Amino acid sequence: MPAWVLGSLRGYRRSWWRRDLVAGLTVWAVLIPESLAYASIAGVSPVVGLYAAIPALLLYPVIGSSRHLVVGPMSATAALSAGVVGGIVSNDSGDFPAYTAGLALAVGTLAVLAGLLRLGFLANFISEPVLKGFIVGMALVIIVGQLPKLLGIEGGDGDFFQKLWAVVASLGDVSGWSALVGLGCLALVLVLRRTAPLVPGSLVAVALGIMLAAVLDLEDRGVEVVGHIDAGLPAPGVPDLTAASDIPLLLSGAAGVMLVGFAEGLGAAKTYARRDGYRIDADRELAGLGAANLGAGLLDGMVVNGSLSKTAVNAGAGARSQVSGWTVAALTVLTLLVLTPLFASLPEPALAAVVIAAVIELVDIGGLRRLYDVNTAALTTIYGRAARADFICALGALLGVLFFDTLPGLLIGVVLSVVLLLARTAHPHVAVLGRVAGGAGQWVDVERDPGSSPVSGVVVVRVESGLYFANADAVQDRLLELATADGVRALVLDAATVPSVDVTAAGMLRDVAAELDARGVRLLAVGDVGQVRDVLRRTGAGAVLDRLYPTVEAAVAATSPGEGEAAGDGAARR
């Protein structure tokens, strides 16, 4: 058996089982109502969330590397699922549940393949600011989408703003009983979260809603209920898709869903691995996510991924291994076998309240404000509008979700982050350095430390970026501008801060050296990085290395009248 199979359970101790059992029971109390709620976000019957949770909890530990991660339906991927499937078949179509399960299979297939190909680094392409903006936008869309159920009114179609306007326009038709149940359950969950965080508020709200439905006969009073749910487990099988031509559409949407789910789950797994001193294998996490989704799809479920909130509950309750996850799976099976008749009378407003309570804390306006405040006047001077790249990316993803739906919003954020990264690296800061008085050879940016002193006739510069084709011209223009000013006899380039160089940039350095030589200005370099040295030599720009010095002080000293270039020849060659 491969070493990675059940790797998260290796070293299991018998003394752990009590903690794992208690943690599993605690997570079950949170997972049941949230899975019901997230299934409604995905546009399918609430019980589909339970169908998906069971194989996810059973299969992830077989491959995954986290001892604590809880895998199941989540709000972000549920919203993405609704968007992807809704773009293929109508929300009212009888095929919607099958396509939802088909999307889980597509996500699982892609994730397993990506894990086998060791593509775990893909999560790095969704930056934290993009994910922040996406999640805030998604949470707002979910909340507005649940308001009609919460208040017992007709909802609207379209983007976030069209749905919001439909809610506002229908406020005169609010159902009193629906609003009372929905708002009451919402208030209950939020109050319990603040005053009694150990109490599973969502489960309490669901139980209260079921009790009120029975005692007050809410269905006869016009309150919508979940309705009949078949008891037991569905038979495993491949979803019946009506058209094979829809499979490419599912696969294309599955790529974005997989990335979001993987990024969210990987972050949760790493958080608790750091706390307990073990390592997470990103490729195994991808494959584990894939196995969980394949199982969910084959059991008529929906897309699943790792949950930070439920993982926190799991770890906080003392879980030591994935035995806690298997405990949750067993309890969920028991729930489907015995308790499903109770969920039939669950009021839709109570379920909407659980959904809203679950996502309302994701509307992190303070986090967006912190991204905005990261910018400084100095950064604005250097990068212009691109100085607020993180905030712009988050805002782009947020607005993209609100105007164009979830997956397009995510893509907008990713594209913006790449464009702004290129914009910043295409015009890197070329700092002019000055000597710090009494600093024992310390050189700093004169713009940031006015007390530093430039050397007369010598310009010392530091390029704060790697050099490549996109910024070669900008750096060349800046170097020549500084080196050809009146009275300059030498340009010292601190190359220790240049981590990489490509062929285009190497040619640029060769051209700069030649032009400065023709003008009688010496070009000297300080320090180097091995890969930079190799590229310069292999591209014919090795002459720059013949003027290489170990320190800025040594290079500046070599520019003094009477000092020859030979003073630096080979001084820093390695």
Predicted regions and their residues:
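Structured cytosolic domains appended to multi-pass membrane proteins
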Residues: 433-574
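Transmembrane helical cores of multi-pass ion-transport proteins
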Residues: 1-440, 447, 455, 471, ...
